[in-house]
């Protein structure tokens, strides 16, 4: 029987939804979607030689098995995955193009002032939170997200004009350093809020690893673009390139919104099968509330307060480890070029390991061991790492601990951490999450930096400080485990029928 004849009515309607969402252009997602449909219908990918059918797992086509086990369950979902991947790729590529300029501006602003610039970043975060709260009060998601990116694009172009006018005052350099630090956390927080608002809990377990891989690929492509173009264009002229990539993210946002709406509007049953609930009318309205609603939401929810503790411990221990790394590498090598080479090798190892885990293992790990153990795995790893540093604070140990910690965080813990927000309300996804990811995160950075400096000033060696961090990592692991279990309870409660006795609000 021809493959076309084997399509169900729901497949046909979803195909019509695809056309509504993407017409008139055809993207790579269309080709992938058609290939998967053909495979599901018993066909083969035309990439294979004629007559050759690559199979496995009970005779199923190999690519079908690979896609189903690592990514989307159906071609329509694969399209959304492609747009989300592209969105995160462009976002982090844009950031990593300007990140080297930020580091240079940090030096230009005075190395002796770096701790004050960290504090300035925290104060800037305090100003951003009410600004974001005001925006979400006035506009719906499809309106305020593009406006936020227009704002950041305008900021980039303003700095471009300032640098082109040879305005190189130290205050401009410091302002750029602080702005990029705010920009980084803010855009990533908003991205994951939007993902939590787009995909269901079940979809997030399968797709977040691959979506995160898009960010990793962007983080690799950004420095590569910078290294390739900076010789010919100069660092300042890379700012419009960063702005152009940021503009592309708005296309991805509109496509993802259209994908969700088209799926539910054309066939609500098919939308439910994909894990998309019927359209919530409140999603079409602005969220309203106070501009400081994020703070209030956190204070009223023990679940969100637990996430705050998780982020505080995460950022504090990461700062401790960063200071340990700086001390050990400084004492191991006198040559700045050698130190740079060590850091570059570590970054490459982290990104390579992260990308492989995100694409092939993240979803399986979360589904296999559950949210609790997934979230606790990296704190337990770091607890072991600090214990090792307490015994042997040497280069080999810090390199292994940092590479494994960073790769595990990006590949496993970050996607799982973002899943904590899938089960909360829309207002909490945007307002509370933004407060936690910016003010709480940078607050933890700032406080822990001064605490570490105080411990050093008190005469404690790096090994002693590492041992002090061990129980903190244990507390972090316990909180992470409990939050993961709580998230699973809330997800089950949300999936239960309205009158089911199991349906309750654990928060």
What are these regions (language model features)?
Residues 34-35, 44-85, 111, 138-143, ...:
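Intracellular loop-helix junctions on the cytosolic face of multi-pass helical membrane proteins
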Residues 80-132, 172-231, 274, 286-297, ...:
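Substrate-agnostic recognition of the 12-TM MFS/MFS-like secondary transporter fold
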Residues 122, 149-156, 243-247, 315, ...:
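Residue-level recognition of pore/gate-forming positions within transmembrane alpha-helices
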Residues 137-138, 197, 231-232, 367, ...:
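Membrane-helix boundary and inter-helical linker elements of multi-pass secondary transporters
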Residues 138-151, 367-378:
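Cytoplasmic membrane-interface "Motif A"-like loop-to-helix N-cap segments
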Residues 151-168, 381-393:
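C-terminal ends and interior cores of transmembrane alpha-helices
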Residues 228-244, 454-473:
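A membrane-interface helix-boundary motif in multi-pass transporters
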Residues 375-409:
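C-terminal transmembrane helical hairpin of 12-TM major facilitator-type secondary transporters
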């Amino acid at each position: 029987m021809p493959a076309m004849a084997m399509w169900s009515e729901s497949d046909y309607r979803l195909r019509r939804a695809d056309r509504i969402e993407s017409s008139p252009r055809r993207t790579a997602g269309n080709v992938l979607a058609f290939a998967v449909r053909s495979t599901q219908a018993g066909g083969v990918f035309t990439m294979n030689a004629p007559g050759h059918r690559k199979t496995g797992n009970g005779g199923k086509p190999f690519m079908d098995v690979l896609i189903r086990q690592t990514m989307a369950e159906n071609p329509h979902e694969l399209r959304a995955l492609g747009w989300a991947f592209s969105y995160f790729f462009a976002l982090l590529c844009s950031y990593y193009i300007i990140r080297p300029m930020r580091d240079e501006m940090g030096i230009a602003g005075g190395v002796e002032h770096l701790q004050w610039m960290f504090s300035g970043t925290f104060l800037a975060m305090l100003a951003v939170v009410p600004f974001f709260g005001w925006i979400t009060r006035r506009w719906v998601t499809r309106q305020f997200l593009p406006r936020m990116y227009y704002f950041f694009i305008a900021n980039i172009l303003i700095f471009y004009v300032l640098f082109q006018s040879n305005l190189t005052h130290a205050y401009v350099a410091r302002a750029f350093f602080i702005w990029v630090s705010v920009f980084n956390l803010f855009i990533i927080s908003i991205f994951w809020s939007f993902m939590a608002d787009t995909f269901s809990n079940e979809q997030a377990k399968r797709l977040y690893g691959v979506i995160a891989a898009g960010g990793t690929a962007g983080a690799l492509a950004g420095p590569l673009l910078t290294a390739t173009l900076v010789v010919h264009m100069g660092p300042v002229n890379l700012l419009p390139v960063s702005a152009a990539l940021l503009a592309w993210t708005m296309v991805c946002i509109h496509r993802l919104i259209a994908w969700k709406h088209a799926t539910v509007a054309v066939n609500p049953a098919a939308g439910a099968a994909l894990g998309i609930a019927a359209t919530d009318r409140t999603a079409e309205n602005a969220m309203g509330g106070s501009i400081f609603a994020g703070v209030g939401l956190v204070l009223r929810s023990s679940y969100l307060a637990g996430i705050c503790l998780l982020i505080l411990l995460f950022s504090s221990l990461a700062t401790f480890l960063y200071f340990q790394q700086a001390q050990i590498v400084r004492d191991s090598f006198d040559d700045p070029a050698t130190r740079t080479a060590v850091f570059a090798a570590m970054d490459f190892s982290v990104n390579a390991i992260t990308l492989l885990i995100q694409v092939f293992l993240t979803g399986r790990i979360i589904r296999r061991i559950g949210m609790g153990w997934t979230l606790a795995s990296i704190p337990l790893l770091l607890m072991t790492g600090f214990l090792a540093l307490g015994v042997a604070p040497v280069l080999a140990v810090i390199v292994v601990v940092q590479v494994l910690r960073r790769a595990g965080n990006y590949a496993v813990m970050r996607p799982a951490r973002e899943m904590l927000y899938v089960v909360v309300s829309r207002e909490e996804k945007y307002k509370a999450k933004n407060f936690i990811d910016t003010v709480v995160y940078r607050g933890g950075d700032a406080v822990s930096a001064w605490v570490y400096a105080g411990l050093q000033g008190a005469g404690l060696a790096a090994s002693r400080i590492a041992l002090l961090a061990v129980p903190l990592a244990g507390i972090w692991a316990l909180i992470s485990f409990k939050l993961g279990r709580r998230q699973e309870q809330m997800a089950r409660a949300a999936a239960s029928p309205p009158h089911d006795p199991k349906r309750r609000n654990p928060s």
